[in-house]
């Protein structure tokens, strides 16, 4: 019983530590917008802000491949075989 309680305590502790060590994210996993350093900022601070802002914009506008809804795409089995013969009507030249 003591071993089970110890394992449960370690699991709870490791879960709490893992949650606390996660990077700070905004709502629904979006990164936080960088804070403007002010009008009297040094050129180094402005360069760092510009780099952070560029990273922030790139993160928000990156393409998300493979994140489509199931209704928007057809299943491969619905396409049919690419080698299947397509029935066609006979033309007067075929007769």
UniProtKB/Swiss-Prot annotation:
Localization: Secreted
Primary location class: secreted
Chain positions listed as propeptide in the UniProt record: 89-95
GO BP annotations listed: feeding behavior; neuropeptide signaling pathway; protein secretion
Gene assigned in the entry: PPY
Signal peptide range in chain numbering: 1-29
The family this protein is said to belong to: Belongs to the NPY family.
Superkingdom classification of source: Eukaryota
Organism: Homo sapiens
Induction info: Released in circulation upon food intake. Also up-regulated by exercise.
Residues with Tyrosine amide modification: 65
Pfam families: Hormone_3 (PF00159)
Disulfide bonds: none
GO terms assigned for molecular function: G protein-coupled receptor binding; hormone activity; neuropeptide hormone activity; neuropeptide Y receptor binding
Identification of the protein by name: Pancreatic polypeptide prohormone
Entry GO terms, CC: cytoplasm; extracellular region; extracellular space
Matching InterPro entries: Pancreatic_hormone-like, Pancreatic_hormone-like_CS
Keyword annotations of the record: Amidation, Cleavage on pair of basic residues, Hormone, Pharmaceutical, Secreted, Signal
């Amino acid at each position: 019983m003591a071993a089970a309680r110890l394992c449960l305590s370690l699991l709870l502790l490791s879960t709490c530590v893992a949650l606390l060590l996660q990077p700070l994210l905004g709502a629904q996993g979006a990164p936080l917008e960088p804070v403007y350093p002010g009008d009297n900022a040094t050129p180094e601070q402005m360069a760092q802000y510009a780099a952070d802002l560029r990273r922030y914009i790139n993160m928000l506008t990156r393409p998300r491949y493979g994140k489509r809804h199931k209704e928007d795409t057809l299943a491969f089995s619905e396409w049919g075989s690419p080698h299947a013969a397509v029935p066609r009507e006979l033309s007067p030249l075929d007769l």
